[in-house]
């Protein structure tokens, strides 16, 4: 409930810190609404400070749904912005942290070229497409990547047995071990792995509608994730309803995620519009 205060303080502290450390960055890369005020504050209060002049700001969008929207009273009570600058963060009668970053950052990036195009569409933009259309000249999508040293089944220490495309035998060992770890019986049925945040934009409603049907087709499911309580409860119920078919771990365990990527036959990405997610790349 106090996230606006927390991240306002954090954003201001980032810039104040630069006055007191022996390092001047060339670029400040700010991610999502939680640090969206950094380019706002820099443009208003810090660009003219001699020891901080010349720094460029880049704002990266991972999910445009979460924008940091609050009442306009935040401008005077919390943000400490001068009256003349309220229009920078105002959008549709609210303070919108992300909109402020769009206005003031030198560059706007996001996690894929496709997503950069999609968020110009009202269907995907969650209301911010008019602003982004006016900022197209500084909007670029860079495709997400993964660390191939970390996501490498031939060397991954989290796996019970390593394997590769040239030597794939360890894949079957990983599948058997995964089923045992998740409390499911071994068998020949295809195993579908899901590693995701359990929220609506990641496809929670979509998979809830078809889950019973998919279990009926003969799949086994191993699921790792956390998020909104309603979706966590759905998967808990499915694990109770199909104890030999569905196993769920609520939370995020990095090593288990690697074992799901390695042991599952199919990686399921239910999000209707995944923004260049790392899960499919990792699997």
Where are these regions (language model features)?
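Catalytic cores of nucleotide-sugar-dependent glycosyltransferases that transfer UDP/GDP/TDP-activated
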Residues: 1-283
């Amino acid at each position: 409930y106090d996230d606006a205060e927390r991240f306002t303080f954090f954003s201001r502290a980032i810039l104040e810190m630069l006055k007191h450390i022996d390092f001047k960055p060339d670029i400040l890369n700010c991610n999502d609404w939680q640090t969206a005020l950094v380019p706002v504050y820099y443009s208003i209060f810090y660009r003219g400070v001699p020891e901080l002049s010349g720094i460029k700001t880049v704002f990266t969008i991972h999910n445009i749904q979460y924008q940091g929207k609050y009442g306009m009273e935040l401008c005077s009570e919390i943000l400490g912005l001068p009256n003349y600058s309220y229009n920078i963060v105002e959008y549709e009668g609210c303070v919108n942290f992300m909109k402020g970053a769009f206005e003031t950052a030198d560059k706007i990036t996001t996690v894929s070229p496709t997503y950069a195009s999609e968020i110009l569409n009202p269907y995907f933009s969650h209301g911010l497409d008019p602003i982004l259309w006016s900022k197209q000249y500084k909007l670029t999508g860079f495709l997400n990547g993964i660390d191939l040293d970390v996501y490498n089944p031939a060397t991954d220490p989290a796996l019970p047995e390593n394997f590769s495309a040239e030597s794939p035998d360890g894949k079957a060992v990983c599948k058997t071990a995964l089923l045992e770890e998740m409390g499911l019986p071994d068998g020949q049925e295809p195993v579908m792995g899901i590693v995701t945040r359990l929220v609506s934009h990641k496809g929670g409603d979509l998979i809830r509608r078809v889950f019973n049907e998919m279990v009926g087709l003969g799949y086994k499911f191993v699921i790792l994730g956390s998020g909104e309580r309603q979706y966590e409860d759905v998967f808990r119920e499915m694990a109770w309803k199909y104890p030999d078919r569905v196993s769920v771990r609520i939370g995020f365990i990095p090593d288990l995620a690697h074992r799901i990527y390695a042991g599952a036959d199919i990686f399921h990405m239910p999000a209707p519009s995944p923004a260049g997610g790392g899960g499919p790349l990792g699997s």
